[in-house]
Curated annotation (Swiss-Prot):
Cofactor(s) listed in the protein's UniProt record: Zn(2+)
Organism encoding this protein: Penicillium citrinum
Keyword Disulfide bond included in the entry's annotation: no
UniProt name for this protein: Penicillolysin
Binding note for cofactor: Binds 1 zinc ion per subunit.
The encoding gene: plnC
Record keywords: Cleavage on pair of basic residues, Glycoprotein, Hydrolase, Metal-binding, Metalloprotease, Protease, Signal, Zinc, Zymogen
GO molecular function, one term: metalloendopeptidase activity
Active site: E303
Entry's EC annotation: 3.4.24.39
Family note: Belongs to the peptidase M35 family.
Positions contributing to Zn(2+) binding: H302, H306, D317
Catalysis performed (reactions): Preferential cleavage of bonds with hydrophobic residues in P1'. Also 3-Asn-|-Gln-4 and 8-Gly-|-Ser-9 bonds in insulin B chain
Gene3D superfamilies, per the entry: 2.60.40.2970, Collagenase (Catalytic Domain)
Length: 351
């Protein structure tokens, strides 16, 4: 890991503090995907429940950043996503990060998949979107709603797709310098040290610790899954050990302007780049003192798991927070970033 920045700007006391419920099966968001033109897609998100819902739209439809709104598949293999994955706070959420839909109401979002996916080879692809979106009351995440879409099959004109401007621009390496903010550098160095400790302890627990505790977070006790989880955590620990080498570049501050309100940090997985936001330092404690609470160390661990250069494939954000993460299947949990952060926190605190 290379520790750097850009010189120009481009809680409660019990184990279940953050164990939020999944909303009723009668409540859900239905997503309908359709083609507007070429690689431009329209998503219509409908609240199919009987009550109004307010949810976090970061990393979801209506987010204006180049986040992963759909998965793109070619011959059953997912095409590499070249955008950002953002981690946000669970409490004190501002209105600009939230969307409210009344019962039966819809929101529409249009986006171009070619801005975050290389489709220059053209041909047949399939789009789909599913997961869990955090529900908010009084500015705090209190539960989760499932969402799912239709499969949208497209035949892409590669020549047209290649003319679409990419969302992420190449970084100018000449603007890069050693992290010059002494306070942030010190905080991140401490977070990296804590990440090494937490990841190594969690890796040991994954290989030979409590089977029931492992199953709580990864929904299986199979030796093969335990080995994969342990290997990914060991890779995270190795990456966090050095500030001058490794597969990732870690910025003390925002590099591309994606640190909006409530965003703690983000990763560009296709480029193995991680960046912290201002509230990583002002909102998060160095280490959590309660189970499933967010902190700097597990946020850094979470971001490292997104980077395929650390361990391939990189993780996704399939379930955010304890309740959503522990509601995933085993195959989903092993690819869910927060499952690793939550498990490491649990092992550290004896949750």
């Amino acid at each position: 890991m290379r520790f750097t920045t850009l010189s120009t700007a481009f809680l409660a006391l019990a184990q279940n503090v953050y164990a939020f419920p999944i909303e009723s099966d009668l409540s859900a968001l239905d997503v309908t995907l359709s083609q507007v033109s070429d690689t431009r897609i329209k998503a219509v998100v409908k609240n199919t429940g009987a009550e109004n819902v307010t949810f976090v739209h970061l990393n979801f439809f209506r987010d204006s950043a180049p986040v992963k709104k759909v998965s793109v598949y070619r011959e059953n293999n997912e095409v590499v996503f070249d955008g950002i994955k953002r981690r946000f706070q669970l409490q004190g959420l501002a209105s600009e990060s939230l969307t409210t839909l009344e019962a039966g109401e819809v929101l529409e979002d249009e986006f171009d998949i070619a801005t975050t996916t290389d489709l220059s080879s053209g041909g047949a692809i399939t789009l789909r979107s599913n997961g869990l979106v955090p529900v908010v009351k009084d500015g705090a995440v209190t539960g989760y709603l499932p969402y799912s879409s239709n499969d949208l099959k497209l035949n892409i004109d590669g020549a047209k797709a290649s003319t679409v401007t990419k969302a992420l621009k190449p970084l100018d390496r000449r603007t890069k310098e050693t992290c010059s903010n002494a306070s942030r550098k010190s905080a991140l160095e401490k977070a990296l040290s804590n990440t090494v400790k937490l990841a190594n302890a969690a890796a040991t627990a994954a290989r030979s610790g409590s089977a029931s505790k492992f199953s709580e977070y990864f929904k299986t006790t199979s030796s093969s899954t335990r080995s994969v989880v342990a290997a990914r955590l060991e890779a995270v620990a190795k990456e966090a050990q050095s500030a001058s080498s490794g597969s990732t570049t870690y910025y003390c501050s925002d590099t591309l302007g994606y640190c909006e309100t409530n965003v703690l940090a983000y990763t560009l997985p296709a480029r193995n780049i991680i960046a912290n936001c201002d509230i990583y330092y002002s909102y998060l404690p160095a280490l959590a003192g309660t189970c499933h609470q967010q902190d700097q160390a597990t946020t850094t661990l979470h971001e490292f798991t997104h980077a395929p250069g650390v361990y391939s494939p990189g993780t996704d954000d399939l379930g955010y927070g304890y309740s959503a993460a522990t509601s995933l299947s085993s195959s989903q949990a092993v690819l869910n970033a927060d499952s690793y952060a939550l498990y490491a926190n649990a092992i550290n605190l004896g949750c």
